[in-house]
Curated annotation (Swiss-Prot):
Residues 437-484 form the SARAH domain. It catalyses: L-seryl-[protein] + ATP = O-phospho-L-seryl-[protein] + ADP + H(+); L-threonyl-[protein] + ATP = O-phospho-L-threonyl-[protein] + ADP + H(+). Residues 292-334, 442-475 form a coiled coil. Disulfide bonds: none annotated. The gene is STK4. Residues 32-283 form the Protein kinase domain. The modification Phosphothreonine is found at T185. Residues 363-373, 410-428 have a biased composition (Polar residues). This is Serine/threonine-protein kinase 3/4. Proteolytically cleaved by caspase-3 during apoptosis at Asp-328 resulting in a 37 kDa form. Proteolytic cleavage results in kinase activation and nuclear translocation of the truncated form (MST1/N). SMART domains: S_TKc. Residues 315-328 have a biased composition (Acidic residues).
């Protein structure tokens, strides 16, 4: 395995600190060899590449310029200002056709989320403590620089081949200034969002600490709290419910449980800061990053095995196709005496005599399938895959749901009218509060089903109100940005 890693990542001739002015004036293909697509990040696709001059492996995010350029520039600006071993480094950027190429540090082991998913195993307390220690150091640095990440989760904590964790994906990160000390916009990933972020009451750096606590549970259990329910429902539950904890608390030590508890304090003023949490016994006693190397090696071996299996399947398919080509030499088909047609049904021909074939509907799917599109579940196994190229916009990921539901509402106005009727019929009943469900016992099954059906229209109405409130706050900012751009052009 070490030999494979050396072969895939030869030692660079010199360490790349920053791209030279000369390099930045060239076309990116002259400076880098792009090797393969790694996946999707905020606003664009991420590729693995080699810097030709130094031989160093880098990551390149390619972002279509029709994406929210303001957010992209913000991400670059934040990365440019950061110089920490616990934050992904930024080397430079290019414009190429309609894309912006952002050149960043390559983390060969991928994200902590990848580590869990590919191995199909959650992490131990020791492994979690080691990862969280590096993550907290990254957060301490960011918060000292008066920056909020705003999207901390296992998928945005990257690991290099040595096991060092680094914060990445600053697509929604924000700068704190003296004149704007608090944010009041809902940005981030719903399951990891702090209550004060959802409630739009203003927040600061400790919003990242709540997300870190949720990420700790994610590493331990494989998914964050509320992951099994709809994100929209989670948004309403997070601010009102008690802080989440482990599904099976008895599996975890008191130190780990207390660490998570200190992260998940609902009142942000009472929540611990990164510097304080670095002194927590769970973090202070963390083991060195060397304990993560076996996990990383295990993951890479699994990926390599999948690639080899896939290559064998491809080779086997090529051999079968080659044999069929050798056998398929018939161009003239002898018809039976009663058959005078020139176009024949596929079922009447032998395998080796297909010149002009009329397929019926039953044979079309089975005999004419040439390009197979893998399902999204087989991410690691396909060589030719259809990848969704949708770009994440500069809004909370869950707000895409609002837009989708709005389209569905327009297309299904009739069903909406029925839903409204249900909503009207339910106006005279009260939702049980604080777990008091005694009143439900007196209702009939039909009544319970009717009232359950009325909940969704109510939720959609509340969601629409949130969307409109968000848009009302967002539009003046966009107008101000446009005004500043026009002013700069005039001067």
């Amino acid at each position: 395995m070490e030999e494979v890693q050396r072969r895939q990542h030869p030692h660079p001739r010199r360490s790349l600190k920053k791209l030279s002015e000369d390099s930045l004036t060239k076309q990116p293909e002259e400076v880098f060899d792009v090797l393969e697509k790694l996946g999707e990040g905020s606003y664009g696709s991420v590729f693995k590449a080699i810097h030709k001059e130094s031989g160093q492996v880098v990551a390149i995010k390619q972002v279509p310029v029709e994406s929210d350029l303001q957010e992209i520039i913000k991400e670059i600006s934040i990365m440019q200002q950061c110089d920490s071993p616990h934050v992904v480094k930024y080397y430079g950027s290019y414009f190429k056709n309609t894309d912006l190429w952002i050149v960043m540090e390559y983390c060969g082991a991928g994200s902590v989320s990848d580590l869990i998913r590919i191995r199909n195993k959650t992490l131990t307390e020791d492994e979690i403590a080691t990862i969280l220690q590096s993550t907290l150091k990254g957060l301490e640095y960011l918060h000292f620089m008066r920056k909020i990440h705003r999207d901390i989760k296992a998928g945005n904590i990257l690991l290099n081949n040595e096991g060092h964790a680094k914060l990445a994906d600053f697509g929604v990160a924000g700068q704190l200034t003296d004149t704007m000390a608090k944010r009041n916009t809902v940005i981030g990933t719903p399951f990891w969002m702090a209550p004060e972020v959802i409630q739009e009451i203003g927040y600061n750096c400790v919003a990242d600490i709540w997300s870190l606590g949720i990420s700790a549970i994610e590493m331990a259990e494989g998914k964050p709290p509320y992951a099994d329910i709809h994100p929209m429902r989670a948004i309403f539950m997070i601010p009102t419910n008690p802080p989440p904890t482990f599904r099976k608390p008895e599996l975890w030590t008191d130190e780990f449980t207390d660490f998570v508890k200190q992260c998940l304090v609902k009142n942000p003023e009472q929540r611990a800061a990164a510097t304080q949490l670095l002194q927590h016994p769970f973090i202070k006693n963390a083991k060195p990053v060397s304990i993560l190397r076996d996990l990383i090696t295990d993951m890479m071996e699994i990926k390599l095995k999948r690639q080899e299996e896939q290559q064998r399947d491809l080779d086997q398919d090529d051999e079968e196709n080659s044999e069929e080509d050798d056998m398929d030499s018939g161009t003239m088909v002898r018809a039976s005496a009663e058959d005078t047609g020139t176009m024949r049904a596929a079922s009447t021909l032998s395998d080796g005599a297909r010149t002009m074939i009329e397929h019926d509907s039953s044979t079309l799917d089975s005999q004419m399938g040439t390009m197979v599109i893998n399902s999204g579940e087989d991410e690691e196994d396909g060589t030719m895959k259809r990848k969704e190229e949708t770009i994440q916009q500069s809004k909370p990921s869950f707000l895409e749901y609002f837009e989708q539901k709005e389209k569905e509402n327009q297309a299904n106005s009739h069903s909406n009218r029925n839903a409204q009727a249900l909503q009207n019929s339910s106006d005279n009943w009260k939702v049980p509060q604080d777990g008091d469900f005694e009143s439900l016992k007196s209702w009939s099954v039909e009544e319970l089903q009717r009232r359950l059906a009325s909940l969704d229209p109510t939720m959609e109405q509340e969601i629409e109100e949130i969307r409109q409130r968000y848009q009302a706050k967002r539009q003046p900012i966009l107008d101000a940005i446009d005004a500043k751009k026009r002013w700069q052009q005039n001067f």
